[in-house]
């Protein structure tokens, strides 16, 4: 099926792909995105590796939420889900470029 030269070339391509994927993963680990809820009253900044870097709650919301802890919790959760969704989307776009055209599941081999 593959000659020695063909198999060697294929292995070299696979190694290069793995190196490029590692670089992309490292970049994603530093790429920050922001999710928000309540028209920006709660903002969460996280990396595409899901490391939360910052939570910003509007002082106005803190005053309003003094009597409504559940509302504040819901807004924080919504902002976190928003940030996580954006992080996943960004990561999938970036990593998808490496696995485009490969059979399903083969891309997981390189992660």
Curated annotation (Swiss-Prot):
Molecular function terms from GO: DNA binding
Subcellular location: Cytoplasm, Nucleoid
GO CC term, one of those recorded: cytosol
The organism's place on the tree of life at top rank: Bacteria
Keywords: Cytoplasm, DNA-binding
Signal peptide interval: none
UniProt similarity note: Belongs to the YbaB/EbfC family.
NCBIfam families: DNA_YbaB_EbfC
Protein name: Nucleoid-associated protein NMB1444
């Amino acid at each position: 099926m593959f000659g020695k030269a063909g198999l060697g070339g294929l292995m070299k391509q696979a190694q290069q792909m793995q190196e490029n994927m590692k670089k992309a993963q490292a970049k994603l680990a530093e790429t920050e995105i922001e999710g928000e809820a309540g028209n920006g009253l709660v903002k969460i900044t996280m990396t595409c590796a899901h490391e939360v870097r910052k939570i910003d709650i509007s002082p106005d919301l803190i005053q309003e939420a003094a009597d409504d802890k559940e509302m504040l919790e819901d807004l924080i959760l919504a902002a976190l889900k928003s940030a996580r969704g954006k992080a996943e989307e960004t990561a999938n776009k970036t990593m998808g470029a490496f696995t485009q055209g490969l059979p399903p599941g083969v891309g997981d081999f390189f992660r």
